[in-house]
Amino acid sequence: MNILIFGGLNIKIHIMRIAESEFIINDDGSAFHIHLKPEELADIVILVGDPGRVDMVAGFLTDIEFRHQSREFVSTTGKYNGKRITVLSTGIGTDNIDIVMTELDALANVDFTTREPKKEHRTLTILRIGTCGAVQADIPLGSPIFSHYSVGCDGLMNWYEGRDELSNL
């Protein structure tokens, strides 16, 4: 049994070997949608919605290792002040975020040869930079917002174990 840490909550997940139909690995060894290989993923990941923002953020990086693009998923890995960072676009919507987060977790924690969870869990630091709406009238448009977590009201979490814990946030 593996434990997924999401928003400070420990969610138990039961995974054995992941079937080819459940997680597609491209012929080049990359994750199907985001086209990243496990060794290309840094421990620090910056997510942006708009693919055009990847190059803007990457402008602050040195030692760029690659730039991939597949549909709305654009990625690059480089260094900022000596720290390795991956920048990746998600596109719009919770469906895309779900795809990206699932594939990032697989890149970090699944052995792509055996399709089984790795014995040692790798934790990623993920920072999302982008636009958002606010439900508080006292937050003016254009204000910087720093959140600890977000919860969608679209029903996506109904497909995950631990949804009852998350619904009480």
Show the residue positions of the predicted features:
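N-terminal amphipathic/basic-hydrophobic helices that include classical n-h-c signal peptides
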Residues: 1-15
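Metabolite-binding pocket within alpha/beta catalytic cores that recognizes anionic/polar moieties
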Residues: 15-169
